[in-house]
Structure formats: structure tokens, C-alpha cells
UniProtKB/Swiss-Prot annotation:
Plays a role in virus cell tropism, and may be required for efficient virus replication in macrophages. This is Protein MGF 505-4R. Induction: Expressed in the early phase of the viral replicative cycle. Coiled coil: none annotated. The keyword Transit peptide does not apply. It comes from African swine fever virus (isolate Tick/South Africa/Pretoriuskop Pr4/1996). The keyword GTP-binding does not apply. Keywords: Early protein. Belongs to the asfivirus MGF 505 family.
Length: 501
């Protein structure tokens, strides 16, 4: 059962000024050698009415003095009992450690709250762990003096390397510097790997400090190492890392900036290309081609084009090839705005490489290209399947076959390319088989075949029309057309056909 006095001590946040030392002692609110003690917040106390300190700090001091009455009071004020252990260690109060230690599951949990290296080490001893555990925790909690104290234990390169890596990853700069200057390390370059990975400029500068003060034994050629660092920084968009590296050597060449292009880091490109001593015009042209391949943003492409003054005569063909190969035509859009039109050669390339119908649709929509032009281009390349897919996408209903039929006939009439005509005539005949034509329309189609010298299609259709009324005189009419058009093969076949009549 709690007494009224206990309840008052726990919940009284403001002690009346009229309370003298005797009353405060009676209430248990007096701290020997310090004065009055009152709670002013959940996490702070007021000592002698003029000093504010945290509850945990007061608990640490009280424990170091062995004052259990004040300890109990502060614990009732929500103090952390970890600070009882810390204070007890500072004051060598092992009776308190014995009393409160049973509440501690793992003494490692307390280490983060300890500022004093000696207390830190004493606390770690309570865990009954080995020296390597102490070193590892000393690194974790930035206790350099503990590492310096136990320097003689750090003799194995592989073990040191592990500790060094931990220090780098934990970003304990003083420890990293001391280890790099003092210990034998298996892979000292790890500091650079971590610096780039964590984007830690301080680690990078420490690494270079160790490297160029001859404290770091690296087998690589320094120029190669610095170039590698420049490439990594360019790929990650870390301009300040590049500038720091350049203080020590290295060269920003095409290979370095190509990494910036691949990852669309425009700020780096602008910074170094503006300083023309780094790159030739040919290098910038090659960077532009790399940007096309890597689907760079419009801003990056425009930046590179601006440094070429939009003059691309030397690489026009290469631009077309890179666009066709990669499938990203953003550069073509930008160039067209500058009156440089590469749309047709690129479209031809896309058709050659049989890009998907959806892709072609998007392309012709972007550049307002008429579908008839695409069909003609595909026909010239003999891409029959592509034409079929394209038409199926555009004309999705079966009723549209008649429309397609008329469209293809019109295209044949305006096409001069022989192979292109043959491709379209094959498709026209396939559609003829799928739709219904009356006698008049059939004769009209036969006449169309004769005019365009489509002998195979003509003969195939004649088999279907052989028994139609008026077919014989119509064949003679077709012969006249073939003679006028000078189609020898067609003439020969019609003459043979007329004999069977």
C-alpha cells in the first residue's frame, strides 16, 4: 500500500517556496549535498530550485553516489534504470549493480547511453564477452580511446579489415582515419566503395587523405583508380565527388561522361562539356548517340544537341541507326522541331525491323503520317504480315473488309514499285476470297488484275468466273487491255484461256 507521502512525491510537480529544508527532508524531496529536488516535467528535475537536469542524468549521479533513497524517488519519476547501472559503474557501487542487474537482459543494451570510455569498458565486462566483441561495440559507439588502448590486439589483417569495414559503414570518421593510419588492412579500398555507396563525402576525403599520405597500401595504378572513381561518380550523378577526385588526378574523358549519359545526369554533362578542354566535337557526337541508345530524357538530348549547335550532318546516318536499333525516337521529335526531318528513314527502318503494330501506330500518330504511306512502305519491303496486322488493328470489324479492299486497290493504282504492287495484289486476292462480289464487281476486279499485270490472281479468279454469263466476250475485252498495256505474259495466258472457251 502506498503512503500519502509516496503519492505526493510521485505526482507533485511544484514544491511550494514555503517548504524549508526540514519539510523537504520529511517529504523525501531533499538530495544530500545537492539540495531540494522536485519534478518539473516527465523527463526533468529541478535541483535546489536553480538547476534543471534530466531525470536520467540525476539518476546516474545519485547511483554514482550510492544514494538509494534518491534512486528510488527518481525511478518513481519514470527514470530509466539503465542509468542506475551506469552511475553505479562510475562510482564502483557494485552492490547497486548486484541489486538492479537482474533487470538487465543484455548489458549491450546500455552501451549506447554511456559517454565515458572507462565506464563503457566496465559495462561490457559485465556481459562476459571477448575482446573482439568489445572492439566491435567500441567502433559502433565511437569509442576511439578503447581501440587505442587495445592497439596490441589488432594485429591480424583480416580481422582488422572486418573492423575497418564496420567503421566505414557506421560512418565513424575518427576511427576510420585512425585505423587507416595505424593498422594493417587487407582491402583498404573498401572506404571508397562505401563512400560511393552511401554518398558519403567525408569518407571519400578521408580515403584520399590516407591514400596520398601513403598510409594506404593499394596495388592498383593510381590513375586507373581515380578514373574508376570518376566513372562511378558520374554514373551516380555525384558531381562534388568528381570534383574532389579531380583534385588528386584523373581525367574526365568520353568514357567517364558516357556513364553520366547512361544514367541521364545532365548536370554533370553540362558542367564538363561547358569546359571544352575535356571533350572534342566527335566525343560530344558520340555522347549524343549514347544518349539515344540509353533513352535519355528530352532535356539531356537537347543539351547535347545545343553543344553541337544542332549540326548533325556527320552523324545523321548513325542517329537513324541508333534510333532504329533502340526504338526510342525522342531525338527525331526534337530534330523535326529544328526543321531536321529524319522521320521517313526512321520509319523505313522500323518497318524493316518489324516493330510491333502498336509501336508503329504511336510513331505515325506522333508525326501525323497517313496510314496509306505506311502500307506502301511495308509493301515495298514485302512485309505482308505487317500490313495485315496494321489493317486488322485499324479496321476491326468484318464489315470493314470492303473498305480495305477499295483502299488497297487505290494504293495499287498509285504505286510504281513492282514488288510493292505484287504484295498488295496478293492481299487484295485474299480479301476477294473472303467477301461476296456480284458479277459486275467480279468482272471489274478481273479488269483491274489485267491492268496491273496480276497474272496469277487473274487466272485464279477466272476459274471462279468461268460459267458466268458474258464471261467469253469479257475475256476478249481483257485481251485488248493486256495488248494496250503491253503485258506479254498476261496476253499469252488470256489467249490460252480464250481457246478453252
Amino acid at each position: 500500500m502506498f503512503s500519502l507521502q509516496d503519492i505526493c512525491r510521485k505526482h507533485l510537480f511544484q514544491v511550494p517556496d514555503a517548504f524549508d529544508e526540514y519539510i523537504l527532508q520529511a517529504l523525501g524531496l531533499y538530495w544530500e549535498k545537492h539540495g531540494s529536488l522536485q519534478r518539473i516535467r516527465k523527463d526533468a528535475v529541478f535541483v535546489q530550485r536553480n538547476l534543471t537536469i534530466s531525470t536520467n542524468e540525476a539518476l546516474r549521479i545519485a547511483a554514482s553516489e550510492g544514494n538509494e533513497r534518491v534512486i528510488n524517488l527518481l525511478l518513481s519519476w519514470e527514470g530509466n534504470f539503465h542509468y542506475v547501472i551506469i552511475g553505479a559503474l562510475e562510482g564502483n557501487r557494485y552492490d547497486l549493480i548486484h541489486k538492479y542487474g537482474s533487470q538487465i537482459k543484455d548489458y549491450h543494451m546500455i552501451l549506447s547511453s554511456i559517454q565515458n570510455a572507462n565506464t563503457f569498458e566496465k559495462c561490457h565486462e559485465l556481459s562476459n564477452c571477448d575482446m573482439w566483441c568489445l572492439i566491435d561495440n567500441a567502433i559502433k559507439y565511437n569509442m576511439l580511446s578503447i581501440l587505442q588502448k587495445h592497439r596490441n590486439f589488432l594485429t591480424e589483417e583480416l580481422e582488422n579489415q572486418e573492423f575497418f569495414e564496420t567503421a566505414c559503414e557506421e560512418q565513424k570518421y575518427d576511427i576510420v582515419l585512425w585505423m587507416g593510419q595505424t593498422l594493417l588492412l587487407d582491402e583498404p579500398k573498401f572506404i571508397f566503395d562505401t563512400a560511393f555507396k552511401m554518398v558519403d563525402f567525408s569518407l571519400l576525403t578521408i580515403g584520399y587523405s590516407l591514400l596520398f599520405d601513403n598510409k594506404m597500401d593499394i596495388q592498383d595504378d593510381l590513375t586507373s583508380l581515380l578514373t574508376e572513381h570518376l566513372e562511378i561518380a558520374a554514373a551516380k550523378g555525384q558531381l562534388y565527388f568528381m570534383l574532389e577526385t579531380l583534385k588528386h588526378g584523373g581525367d574526365v574523358n568520353f568514357e567517364v561522361l558516357s556513364k553520366a549519359v547512361e544514367n541521364d545526369h545532365r548536370k554533370i554533362l553540362d558542367y564538363f562539356i561547358r569546359r571544352q578542354q575535356y571533350l572534342s566535337r566527335e566525343d560530344i557526337e558520340n555522347l549524343l548517340l549514347s544518349a539515344i541508345t540509353n533513352c535519355a530524357s528530352k532535356k539531356t538530348l537537347n543539351l547535347l544537341l545545343s553543344y553541337l549547335n544542332y549540326s548533325i550532318k556527320n552523324i545523321t546516318e548513325k542517329i537513324v541507326q541508333h534510333v532504329i536499333k533502340g526504338g526510342d525516337y525522342t531525338i527525331i521529335i526534337l530534330l523535326k522541331k529544328k526543321k531536321i526531318n529524319l522521320v521517313e528513314p526512321v520509319l523505313t527502318g522500323f518497318i524493316d525491323h518489324y516493330y510491333g503494330n502498336c509501336f508503329i501506330e504511336n510513331f505515325i500518330r506522333e508525326f501525323a503520317i497517313r496510314p496509306e504511306k505506311v502500307i506502301k512502305m511495308a509493301a515495298r519491303k514485302g512485309k505482308l504480315n505487317m500490313i495485315i496486322e496494321f489493317l486488322n488493328e485499324k479496321y476491326v470489324h468484318k464489315d470493314d473488309l470492303g473498305t480495305i479492299f477499295k483502299l488497297l486497290k487505290n494504293l495499287v493504282c498509285t504505286m510504281k514499285h513492282k514488288k510493292g504492287k505484287e504484295t498488295l495484289l496478293i492481299l487484295i486476292h485474299e480479301i476477294y476470297r473472303a467477301i461476296h462480289l456480284d458479277t459486275k464487281e467480279k468482272f471489274k476486279l478481273l479488269r483491274f488484275y489485267v491492268m496491273h499485270d496480276a497474272t496469277i490472281q487473274f487466272l485464279s479468279m477466272c476459274k471462279d468466273c468461268f460459267n458466268l454469263a458474258g464471261f467469253k466476250p469479257f475475256v476478249l475485252e481483257c485481251l485488248d487491255i493486256a495488248i494496250k498495256k503491253n503485258h506479254p505474259n498476261m496476253i499469252e495466258n488470256i489467249e490460252i484461256l480464250s481457246k478453252y472457251e
